[in-house]
Regions:
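Active-site-lining helix/loop region of Rossmann-like oxidoreductase modules
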Residues: 52, 69-168
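N-terminal Rossmann-like NAD(P) cofactor-binding subdomain of oxidoreductases
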Residues: 1-108
């Protein structure tokens, strides 16, 4: 009845509707969508955008789900002027297990033997979750040679003075 599309290959309504044509009731995409027709939701942050009529939704990404709840709390309580996320992330299926050609030369290196500085789609995805922070969020990714895991470091400049006690 339900499909969790997590291959990373199908990111548009057109591609995902094939599941619905095969009799599936709902599709949940595990990466940010490539078209605006698909709502992107992080539970506990913006699930109120759903009205129940959606057949296809995106659950953003693991990194977006990691950063969004923290960013939401800080933004609601202090306002965010600038945000920069650095994600340390296990290698992904976009990387090769051995050296070979790739459109991004850094990702051409063997994933299981290389620390790879790269981009992160989470910064862009966060601006979809928090449209008011559109020109505020930046970020980078570092892929590391482990098969699973993710860590996000956020540096924030907030609108009002705060203390460690207030944040905690």
């Amino acid at each position: 009845e339900y499909v969790v599309e997590s291959t990373g290959k199908f990111k548009t309504s057109k591609d995902l509707e094939a599941h619905l044509q095969d009799g599936v009731k709902k599709v949940i995409l595990s990466v940010p969508p490539e078209d605006e027709k698909i709502k992107m939701v992080v539970l506990g942050v913006n699930q109120d955008i759903l009205d129940g009529s959606e057949k296809i939704i995106s659950n953003a990404s693991c990194t977006t789900n990691n950063a969004a709840p923290m960013l939401d709390v800080i933004n609601k309580n202090f306002g965010v002027k600038h945000a920069y996320i650095s994600t340390i992330h296990s290698y992904t299926s976009d990387q090769s297990l051995h050296d070979r050609p790739h459109r991004d030369l850094r990702r051409a290196r063997a994933a299981t033997q290389s620390i790879v500085p790269t981009t992160t789609g989470a910064a862009k995805a966060l601006t979809k979750i928090f449209p008011e922070l559109k020109d505020v969020i930046g970020g980078c990714g570092i892929r590391v040679p482990v098969p699973n895991g993710s860590l996000t470091d956020m540096t924030l400049n907030v609108n009002k003075a705060t203390s460690i006690e207030e944040v905690n």
